[in-house]
């Protein structure tokens, strides 16, 4: 969030001028939760998500779970996340990541909020946990999708949407291109992962929401469809996933905190 502290208003206005109707900002630990609420209450086009990112899983505890549950009552908080596993950097022990992930999945199911799943270098473990917990009551999105087609098919079979980042515009994105070709358009989203992973030709620079247009154009090219047709489909997917009214009342933490 610090990356946009000085020019957040200008960045959002630039995105709106590009025709972007919805944006999602994510609070990945307790220090950012109130900032997310401040942002979503200041900009009508921006919605929020909160959760404990796998990097911060070692800090997850029962009290923090209660704090999250309270924030989830805000109707403009439309998703639980990012939650998941990151075995690339391992900022938190793997056992802590798995424990926090499983507990937060239970809260997401009870709250009927979609989960935003972060998974890096943890494909098999993520699929195993989601498969074990899958009962038809958990939905969500695999954020910044980076795995192969075989994994994509497993996530899709569990009902998840795949969110495509700006890396799809890179020359070496052959595996991700195969995923986009295969995945039904109603199970795709486009994202920036700002400030990271700016699409070509902005690679290496600070990413921002307005750049998502470049990702959408690439998806349209791969699908052999018009850009506006793809954009409209992705808009509907966002609305269906995040802006539905079927929210649960009980977002309490599981009794067993382990």
At which residue positions do the language-model features occur?
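Mid-domain alpha/beta scaffold segments of enzyme catalytic cores
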Residues: 1-258
């Amino acid at each position: 969030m610090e990356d946009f502290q000085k020019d957040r208003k200008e960045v959002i206005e630039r995105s709106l001028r590009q025709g972007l109707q919805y944006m999602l900002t994510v609070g990945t630990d307790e220090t950012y939760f109130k900032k997310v609420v401040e942002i979503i209450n200041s900009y009508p086009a921006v919605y929020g998500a909160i959760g404990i990112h796998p990097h911060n899983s070692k800090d997850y505890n029962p009290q923090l779970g209660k704090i999250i549950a309270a924030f989830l009552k805000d109707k403009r908080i439309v998703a639980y996340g990012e939650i998941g596993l990151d075995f690339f950097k391992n900022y938190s022990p793997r056992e802590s990541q798995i424990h926090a992930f499983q507990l937060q999945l239970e809260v997401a199911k009870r709250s009927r909020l979609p989960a935003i799943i972060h998974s890096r270098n943890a494909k098999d473990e993520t699929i195993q946990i989601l498969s074990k917990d899958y009962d038809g009551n958990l939905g969500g999105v695999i954020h910044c999708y980076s795995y192969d087609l075989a994994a994509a098919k497993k996530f899709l079979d569990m009902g998840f949407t795949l969110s495509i980042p700006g890396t799809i515009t890179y020359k070496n994105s052959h595996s991700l291109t195969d995923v986009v070709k295969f995945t039904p358009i109603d199970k795709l989203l486009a994202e920036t992962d700002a400030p990271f992973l700016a699409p070509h030709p902005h690679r290496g620079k600070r990413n921002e929401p307005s750049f998502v247009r470049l990702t959408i154009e690439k998806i349209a090219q791969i699908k052999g469809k018009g850009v506006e047709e793809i954009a409209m489909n992705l808009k509907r997917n966002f609305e269906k996933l995040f802006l539905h009214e079927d929210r649960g009342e009980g977002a309490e933490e599981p009794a067993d905190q382990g």
